[in-house]
Amino acid sequence: RPDLRLCDWFDLIGGTSTGAIIAAGLALGHDCAEIERLYRTLSPRVFIGGYRIPFLQSRFDPRKLEREIAGYLGDVTLGNAPWKTGFAALAKRVDTGSAWVLTNNPRARYWLGDPEEIAAQPDAALRRVVPNHEYRLARIVQASAAAPFYFDIVPIEVEKGSPGAFLDGAMTSHNNPALMLAMVAGVPAYGFAWPYGADELTVVSVGTGSARPRSPAWLRRRLTLPAVKAVAGLTSALYDSSQQANALMQWLGRSPRPWSINSEIGTLAGARHGFPPMWTFQRYDAPLEEAWLKRELDLSLGEAKLLRLRLLDNVGDIDLLLKIGALAGERQVDAQLFG
């Protein structure tokens, strides 16, 4: 079926950071070719110009990212966008130190309704809330993708006259959003309340090219410097949270093709937890590591090249990154999982 879209199969598509951009497009009914074209045009336009005022401003002009995302998604809100399936985006609200997940589900607690319904709320705090359905979709996605250092904080009016300050959802424990989205699907408070079970819920997690943040010898000698320690620690924490999400999803569920978590626990195949599997889980990714790429994809890339591929603002290697993703998909994706 040439007209088949991922929104025809998935009932909820969500993401963090660049994943939120992709998820929004897929949930609106765009096909993968459209999203590939978006990244080919968006990346060179956004990641250009370098620093404005180093250490006082973000590296790139956030207005460019805002303009590209708005042009892609249109001037729609979470409530009136022409959705084809469920959508979720994750972001970090830094002024309150909280992790937010925003969905297009009208049964979500803060979706709320018309002004009369809001005015009738017995909770005074709820009467001040700007309903989730009024949030501009492009603003939500921009907030989820606003990587610190690269882009500015994104303000979103969450209470009347009081904007919240948001940045990249990767700054939460949901850098890999698989576990959080599994909760969104089943925990009644989020509004979906789908049943759990390996034959009831299938969760597909797609990475964007992971890499274990090993420190080269020259950097290890500088790990005593406070700034170096801080950056190394944050980078490692992001990787650790992603791996932990994979570990929990595989341990609590059934995984047809499990990933190795680490050398100690392996894939967790056969690990017991005392109750039936909560879901079927499948992870797809293309680790940007020399040994894996050679072993799995027969690609020989030097460490210097891999260091460049891992950079968020690398716009010169889009073709190579797409090639890696396509090769990984050919080897990993089994159509039987999708019925």
Where are these regions (language model features)?
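Extended charged low-complexity segments that act as oligomerization/scaffolding linkers
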Residues: D11, P54-D61, P122-L126, V130, ...
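Active-site gating loop/helix substructures
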Residues: I48, K84-V187
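Catalytic-loop motifs flanking and including active-site residues across diverse enzymes
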Residues: T18, I22, L65, L137, ...
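C-terminal helical/tail subdomains of lipid-metabolizing enzymes
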Residues: M171-H174, A193-W194, A198, T208, ...
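Hydrophobic, mid-to-C-terminal alpha-helical segments
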Residues: A185-R222
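Short, structural beta-strand-to-alpha-helix junction motif
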Residues: P2-R5, Y72-T85, R136-L137
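Extended hydrophobic secondary-structure segments that form protein cores and membrane-embedded regions
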Residues: D8-S17, G86-K92, A165-L167, A198-P213, ...
